């Protein structure tokens, strides 16, 4: 029965899997993931898919990058109510994203998708409803 802590995955899925293989996590072990799952790395989509399917012995905490990501999605949700969008349409998701980027350019105080994680996920095929599931 071991306890492990990892953090700052930042979209580095391959490295995450190598770490998990190295510790050989068993059902009796506890793994605490201390946040910052997304941004910077090349495989944010894969890391998010892993998060959505973790076993019960894995505790997930949000980091500042995850909070920023969640705020980006919430901002998109607010704007989406003003638009006639199909949340399951990739094209409508791209339209919503472009609208958000335009809004952010108009107001320097608005920070939206600075690391382009949302953009990467949309380009990987994530629709707005799938983004909201996270």
Model region roles, listed by residue range:
Residues 1-50:
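N-terminal active-site segment of His-dependent metallophosphoesterases
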Residues 45-48, 53-134:
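Active-site neighborhood of divalent metal-dependent phosphoester bond hydrolases
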């Amino acid at each position: 029965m071991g306890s492990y802590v990892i953090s700052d995955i930042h979209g580095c899925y391959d490295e995450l899997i190598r770490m998990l293989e190295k510790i050989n996590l068993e059902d009796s072990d506890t793994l605490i993931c201390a946040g910052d799952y997304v941004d910077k790395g090349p495989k944010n989509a894969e890391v998010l898919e892993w998060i959505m399917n973790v076993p019960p012995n894995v505790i997930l905490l949000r980091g500042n990058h995850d909070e920023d990501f969640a705020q980006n999605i919430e901002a998109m949700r607010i704007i989406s109510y003003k638009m006639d969008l199909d949340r399951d349409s990739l094209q409508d998701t791209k339209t919503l994203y472009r609208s958000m980027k335009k809004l952010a350019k108009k107001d320097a105080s608005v920070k939206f998708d600075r690391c382009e994680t949302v953009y990467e996920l949309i380009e990987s095929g994530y629709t707005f409803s799938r983004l909201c599931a996270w």
